[in-house]
């Protein structure tokens, strides 16, 4: 299935309802929008709202991050995505885990919407609401947030 020249959706099985303009793709589903790829086994794509959503686990990948969750949605038009249940964002510099997270594949900003942990080699951040720029590693933490920074160890002088 193709939408314009930037969105391609593949799957082993496709059911399309012309009245509702909803495509249901099953097994080995791949949705590609420029540098963003969504992989799942069950995807519904609403052509009217330009929104794809999965509900049996999925993975969204861009140049910087890999996000997985039980349920999620992605809009190629707005580059916005929403993830729920067992959310994990893996970046070469850190891992963010959460129950609910929004993410923009264009500006690479994760919006924390529930209890979340961001863990890197020397830091552990807990927050229940805030913003985290995955490219600059700058955060704006709101509500209940805790930061633990480990001091790097230095060798003892001889």
Predicted regions and their residues:
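A generic beta-sheet turn/junction motif
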Residues: 18-20, 33, 47-49, 62, ...
